[in-house]
Amino acid sequence: MKHVHIFTDGACSGNPGPGGWGAVLRYGDVEKEMSGGEAETTNNRMELLAAISALNALRQPCEVDLHTDSKYVMDGISKWIHGWKRNGWKTGDRKPVKNGELWQALDEARNRHNVTWHWVKGHAGHPENERADELARKGMEPFKKARRADAVK
């Protein structure tokens, strides 16, 4: 089974507001960079989309070390998701899970692989995390420009 390292990040200008996600995938000495964004979103949604998009880009089941600076993603995938699934994607107080469709997509994506999750401190000089952050900002930029253009009209 191939062993892939993934580094993800999300960014948002305003929360909600224009947002982007970025991911760096590394297999041996081959590296792939990905990014995307949305016009009106939240930072948490972008963090989730980064992980989902990166895992879905893998064409076959892999051993994955996924690195994120998002406590939301780390806590959700390692602590909260089991109860949400047991409760039909509802929280302990029976409310729908926020970003439930993304959590379900992440659960499906991770189940195709053997994923080990790692938390890294954001903006602390971790080169791959910094690159994922740059990619997330790049993914957000077209939506920020569109918002600025709308403000001038």
From Swiss-Prot:
It comes from the Bacteria. Its EC number is 3.1.26.4. Keywords: Cytoplasm, Endonuclease, Hydrolase, Magnesium, Metal-binding, Nuclease. It catalyses: Endonucleolytic cleavage to 5'-phosphomonoester. Mg(2+) 1 binds at residues 9, 47, 69. GO terms for molecular function: magnesium ion binding; nucleic acid binding; RNA-DNA hybrid ribonuclease activity. Residues 123-153 are annotated as: Disordered. It is found in: Cytoplasm. Residues 1-141 form the RNase H type-1 domain. Residues 125-153 have a biased composition (Basic and acidic residues). It is an enzyme of class 3 (hydrolase). GO terms for biological process: DNA replication, removal of RNA primer. Belongs to the RNase H family. Endonuclease that specifically degrades the RNA of RNA-DNA hybrids. This is Ribonuclease H. It comes from Rhizobium meliloti (strain 1021) (Ensifer meliloti). The gene is rnhA.
